Amino acid sequence: MSRIAKKPIVLPTNVQLSITDSEIKVKGPKGELKLNNHPFVSIKVEGNEVWVTPNLEVAKRKADERKFKAMVGTYWRLIRNMVLGVTEGFKKELEIVGVGYRAQLQGNKLIMNLGYAHQVEFDVPADVKVEVPAPNKIIVSGIDKQRVGQVAADIRKWREPNPYSGKGIKYVDEVLKLKEGKKA
């Protein structure tokens, strides 16, 4: 079994967790998140602690137990991220590097000049918030860690950093190792 799942997830006082046969709901001050319940995993709430254990009663063979135990760590982390999301939220910061490269927000569209002959328009999903505090900085935030990361990756994909010059869209904490150019 996953070592991290041997510890319980501690629920803050302002977070409610409800479990049905088909889904897990976590409700907090920032919103509500849902997760499909997996038959391999058993989730128990005891007071303000959530325990995630393998549901070995469903296992038909000894080989299945390994898969079940692997899912425990995954579900422990998913539920923990849901709890963190509805209390604190998640944030990814992107930086635009390059002469003439910039971004601006118009309504729910992110409009970027990235060196193409046309402007790039990116529709911002309703469950994610995008801010542009400066023309070369984009902040993506929300309560669902997977959605925040995916939207940030989709924005970055429009102009990934050039391995020679470093121009493009990069994460603020990303370290680029630039390649050396040709030598004459």
From Swiss-Prot:
Pfam families: Ribosomal_L6. The keyword tRNA-binding does not apply. GO terms for cellular component: cytosolic large ribosomal subunit. Gene3D superfamilies: Ribosomal protein L6, alpha-beta domain. InterPro entries: Ribosomal_uL6-like, Ribosomal_uL6-like_a/b-dom_sf, Ribosomal_uL6_a/b-dom, Ribosomal_uL6_bac-type. It comes from the Bacteria. The keyword rRNA-binding applies. GO terms for molecular function: rRNA binding; structural constituent of ribosome. Keywords: Ribonucleoprotein, Ribosomal protein, RNA-binding, rRNA-binding. GO terms for biological process: cytoplasmic translation. Belongs to the universal ribosomal protein uL6 family. Part of the 50S ribosomal subunit. This protein binds to the 23S rRNA, and is important in its secondary structure. It is located near the subunit interface in the base of the L7/L12 stalk, and near the tRNA binding site of the peptidyltransferase center. This is Large ribosomal subunit protein uL6.
